[in-house]
Each structure stands twice: as structure tokens, then as C-alpha cells.
């Protein structure tokens, strides 16, 4: 169908293509559609199939041309992308540049469209990479094991009424609260009922955990809260608020005893409390190794990305912003548009920490995917089976069920890609030179502060 095409690369990893379609193709499709109309059209005064072509054209020419135009463009795009190696991004549709396109049956038809494609860049050979990574020495003591045991104790506790009826640290309380104006009138839009939280554990929006300690059921109290200028919620930062709070219920956790029976209740695999502690220790050691690998990979990607200029298309950035927004919206109340505004406020290359983090994550994803695509290794059927067996052992779901899931959902391709990604990551890790760092506690290590 395509008579000729001109392709031009634009900034932002965009492709501009000019497509020309022969007038003969246009005329053929137009005449075919005209004949189809003629055979089916019903017009008063004429039998079906006997309406003169001239009358059909006079009455329906614009509609016929519009139909042919749409078909020609759609078929041209299909043909173009079937042969063109620079594919469009799945979340960015091609855009036709011309407005009010019209067909002239006596001339070849030409139209221009623009689309965003995967950015082109080169990654260095792993064997040529010389990167040193300082990895801290992590020490694990009994308190780390005890903390995990305490978490399991809380998870397996029962919530019961607190007969003392007084709010204290760790009480589970249900409250009604509302903001008050200067005249102590309720600001209805801020009213919240049956809000449940654990005193001293939950980070409430208004941060009134400590203010309810000592209150009793059905007690009502008006408090004043002053918020620092860099308070975690911007809309409250630097403000003074009056709040009316009413306690509706006070409960507590009935914690099980930590003994051999407790361990058995956690899982049949544990016969004693020591069995449970040994399992937790092994899990902590595995977690430390995973975090160390993540630290090394972060160092690798940050070092490589600093040396690479990647012309990232806007739609790819938009998709990454939405991912970051979903993670961030749990901690703030801003809309997606407000979040995007923060990102774009000073352009792509500003020094804003949010922007730097999002672009850095995106560049890392692009680099690893490029390395996966270029790596010649093939994922075998045995590799697939081994991964499914591993998932079966970790999840408790049978191998047959996992295999059926991947096949039914057409996810085998993605599983292969994930397996290959892990193989490439192992190659990267093997290429890095580890330097012994300072000694840190397990708690400090897992909070990722040392990984910044």
C-alpha cells in the first residue's frame, strides 16, 4: 500500500514519518466502497442496486472519502510498523500532524505522523567495567531476632476490651475528631468518625497520639496543635489547629506467651522456640545478602547512568511519574496533577530530589533492560521449570498450578525475561569489586539510609 516513506529522528526519542500512498490505491478503495454502497443503498425512486453512481457521489461523497481516509491511514500504519524496527511505545499512540486531512482522488495521498520510541543508547561491556562498591559489615544480635519474635507475637494477638478504660501507650482506640474554628465551631469538612489507631504506633494526620493518653471512654477534649514549618503534611505546616476529640472505645492486645507452643502455632515446621529463632536468623541473613546485592546494583546503575546521555521520551517519564505517585500518595494528599507539576516545575534536568530519584530509577530500568536484550544467553525450558519449582516451594502452591497460571495468562514470555534479568544481574554483581565498609547494625542497614 505504501508508495514511499521518509523517516526522521526528533529530540525526545521521537520518530517523524511521512507516508505516501498511491492515488491508484485510493481510487481503487474509493470505487470499491462506491460499488458496495450502490449494491446496498436504498433511495426513494430507485430499486436497490439501481441507484446511479452520480447520485450516490453527490449525496455521500464526503462520507465515502472520510471512510476511505480512515482505512488508508490505519492500514498504512499497520504496514509501516510491521516493517519498521523503531517500534512505538505501548503507552503512547502515534499522532497525525496534519489537521483536517482530505483525500484528492487524482493525487497521491500523503500524511505525517509522530510517535515516541524506545531511546537509543549504548551500554558498556560488563567485562570492561571497573566499579568499586563499599559494602558495610552488618552485625546481627539477639535483639534483632527478638524484635521479629515480638512482631509475630503482635500479629498473633487477640484484640480485647481494655477493662481499665484509660488510654495509654499501645492502646487501640476508636475516636471521633473534627477541627474547630476560632469561635470553636466545627469545620464540617474535617469531621472524621470511628477513626481507629494504635496510640504511639500510628502516625495520625494531625499527630494527636500523645494528646489522648489518659482520656477515658466517652470523654471529649479540645486540644491545640502547633505544627512545625517542615511538618510532613504541607497543608498543616506552620499552622495552629484546634481539634475536638472524643474517645469511643479503648481496646488492647492480648499477647500470647512466647514459648514452644507459640512457635508451634506459628507453623508446623517449628517444634521449639529455638527452631523458630533459627529460622528467623536464616531469613535475616538472606535479607542482608539481598540488601547488599541491591546496594551493589544501585551503585552500578548510578555510576553507569551518570556516564550515559539517554534521551528519554516524555510518555515514558509520565508513566514513571504515575508509578512514583502511587507509592507516594499513601503519605500525602496531593493529586496526580499536583505531583506532576512538582516534577515539571523546573524542567527535566533540575536538581529537585523527587525529579532526580524518578529519572534515576527510570534510567536504571532502561539500562538493565538494554543489557538483558543484548545478552546472548537463552532461557531454557529447564530454567523455566527451576524458577517455577522455586516459586512453588516459597509460596506453598503446587508446581502444576503455577505452571498453569503462567500458561493461561500468557506470561511465559515475561517470566523468561525476568529469569534472564536475574542472570544478567548476577553477571553485573560478579564484575563489581567489593570494598569492606564500616560496621552497622541490622536495623540501620535495612532502613536503606546507608544506601543513599
Curated annotation (Swiss-Prot):
List the Pfam families: Trigger_C (PF05698), Trigger_N (PF05697)
Catalytic reaction annotation: [protein]-peptidylproline (omega=180) = [protein]-peptidylproline (omega=0)
Q: Does the keyword Cytoplasm apply?
A: yes
Q: Which Gene3D superfamilies match?
A: 3.10.50.40, Trigger factor ribosome-binding domain, Trigger factor, C-terminal domain
GO cellular component annotations of the record: cytoplasm
**Location within or outside the cell:** Cytoplasm
What are its E.C. numbers?
Answer: 5.2.1.8
The record's listing under InterPro entries reads: PPIase_dom_sf, Trig_fac, Trigger_fac_C, Trigger_fac_C_sf, Trigger_fac_ribosome-bd_bac, Trigger_fac_ribosome-bd_sf, Trigger_fact/SurA_dom_sf
Q: Which GO terms describe its biological process?
A: 'de novo' cotranslational protein folding; cell division; chaperone-mediated protein folding; protein transport; protein unfolding
The protein's superkingdom reads Bacteria
Keywords in alphabetical order: Cell cycle, Cell division, Chaperone, Cytoplasm, Isomerase, Rotamase
- Disulfide connectivity for this sequence is none
Q: Which GO terms describe its molecular function?
A: peptidyl-prolyl cis-trans isomerase activity; protein folding chaperone; ribosome binding
Q: Where is the PPIase FKBP-type domain?
A: 170-256
Question: Which protein family is it in?
Answer: Belongs to the FKBP-type PPIase family. Tig subfamily.
Description of its domains: Consists of 3 domains; the N-terminus binds the ribosome, the middle domain has PPIase activity, while the C-terminus has intrinsic chaperone activity on its own.
What biological function has been recorded for the protein in this entry? Involved in protein export. Acts as a chaperone by maintaining the newly synthesized protein in an open conformation. Functions as a peptidyl-prolyl cis-trans isomerase.
Tell me the protein's name: Trigger factor
Q: Which organism is it from?
A: Borreliella afzelii (strain PKo)
